[in-house]
């Protein structure tokens, strides 16, 4: 999937300002951003719900506008909002969804049974949608997205508002889908979710992609690590500033707190400097930045804002 210089405005207010994203076949990709950042607009353009103003979107090298029948057949979307007839059973709704893509009755039956079983909905197959809990509705959305067996699965906030147990169940299932070769695009409010599931992420804010890369790469390049060095005496009793004046550190009783980019390189250097002035070292504790720390530094906002 390729998104090139994608732009979109609503009432002359820019929602996307030249978004560029490449997602490889079989990749698990996360799109992170605060509310109103442009995540859902991007997804809606990919699935034909919103028309772009400028740019190109390709799915398996096919244009989403010129070759919309092909590209939409390759994508399944689990949207935030349900748009179905609430009076039918969930089994019937899944059969309808399969029919929209020309899936044969026999093949649809096998797929519907498989999805109901794997998503824990088998006992609810004869229930109407309005009778399901919020978590069950989320599962149904994923089943609906997968019933025509698309090669790309798009998930828009799939675990928002669900309990912890269900969230972990969905994470397990998404990992299985990824292992089976499914390409997955995820938007989420949960940084932990992106760190756990995604191979690569893009951080978007106010319609602009700020950074892209693996969670590990982003935290290493943009985050700061902390080192807490416990020594055997009160730091204030010793003048250590001449030996550490080029380092970013603070003092608290018998502890030194350092802010460093690379702990592996910093630790030997700090030990060596303290040894030169005979400072007894008792312990070293490391703390690394999280993807959430990087997100806050880049956007200046909470993920939920």
Predicted regions and their residues:
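Catalytic Walker B motif of ABC-type/P-loop ATPase nucleotide-binding domains
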Residues: 153-156
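ABC transporter nucleotide-binding domain
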Residues: 171-261
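Conserved ABC transporter NBD signature motif
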Residues: 55-66, 70-71
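Conserved ABC ATPase signature
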Residues: 128-132
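Conserved catalytic motifs of ABC-family nucleotide-binding domains
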Residues: 149
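Conserved ABC ATPase "signature" region
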Residues: 95, 99, 106-124
